[in-house]
């Protein structure tokens, strides 16, 4: 990928994130972490960086607009997504990547789509962006994070299992609903409920 294209994407993403500097720093952290993981695990570093850079491009869209746009663009909305519309930023972000940011690579768009819940049998790029979102350096310290950061460079599947487990626990402890796909991800990567 050409540096001019990457710089243009960075500028567009910064604008899309409503000048939320913390969100932008998180986004850069995910992009850089994705590229590092790609280098370690033998994936395409440019694709990983772009997917990481665009993973939250629909995050600042108000929830009612997320729902309206998903309907308008023919993107299916599950019951849990209606109840927790923030989950739609992944699906809508993949759509934006393709139609606003002109990303033609389906693998990049799929990595954006699945970065929140994960899914069973993810591609390597999907795994990379999913776990990079969890471990990037700007994340506040949460129980088990340092262990996951150590494991991910040796065993990305184990890191996915542990991060999914932590996410499920966090959502349960806070009385939030859990997307069934998060549970399927956890179980596929070795978790036992």
Language model region names:
Residues 166-193:
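Charged phosphate-binding loop/patch that engages nucleotide di/tri-phosphates or the phosphate backbone
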Residues 2, 78, 124, 175-182:
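A diffuse structural propensity rather than consistent per-protein peaks
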Residues 31-33, 62, 99, 141, ...:
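Residue-level detector of solvent-exposed, low-hydrophobicity positions
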Residues 11-18, 26, 39-162:
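Divalent metal-dependent catalytic cores for phosphoryl transfer on phosphate-bearing substrates
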Residues 7, 57, 88, 103, ...:
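Intrinsically disordered, low-complexity regions enriched in small/polar residues
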Residues 2-21, 31-35, 183-189:
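Short, Lys/Arg-rich amphipathic segments at extreme N-termini
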Residues 9, 28, 99-100, 174, ...:
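Generic alpha-helical secondary structure signal
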């Amino acid at each position: 990928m050409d540096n001019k294209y990457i710089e243009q994407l960075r500028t567009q993403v910064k604008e899309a994130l409503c000048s939320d500097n913390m969100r932008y720093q998180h986004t850069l952290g995910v992009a850089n972490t994705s590229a590092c993981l790609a280098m370690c695990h033998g994936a395409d570093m440019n694709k990983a960086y772009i997917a990481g850079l665009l993973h939250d491009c629909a995050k600042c869209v108000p929830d009612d607009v997320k729902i309206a746009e998903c309907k308008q663009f023919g993107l299916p909305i599950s019951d849990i997504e209606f109840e927790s519309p923030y989950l739609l930023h992944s699906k809508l972000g993949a759509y934006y990547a393709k139609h606003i940011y002109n990303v033609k690579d389906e693998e990049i768009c799929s990595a954006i789509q699945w970065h929140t819940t994960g899914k069973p049998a993810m591609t390597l790029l999907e795994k990379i962006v999913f776990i990079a979102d969890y471990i990037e350096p700007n994340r506040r310290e949460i129980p088990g994070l340092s262990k996951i950061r150590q494991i991910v460079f040796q065993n990305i599947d184990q890191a996915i299992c542990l991060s999914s487990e932590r996410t499920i626990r966090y959502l349960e402890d806070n009385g939030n609903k859990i997307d069934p796909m998060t549970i399927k991800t956890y179980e596929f990567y070795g978790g036992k409920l």
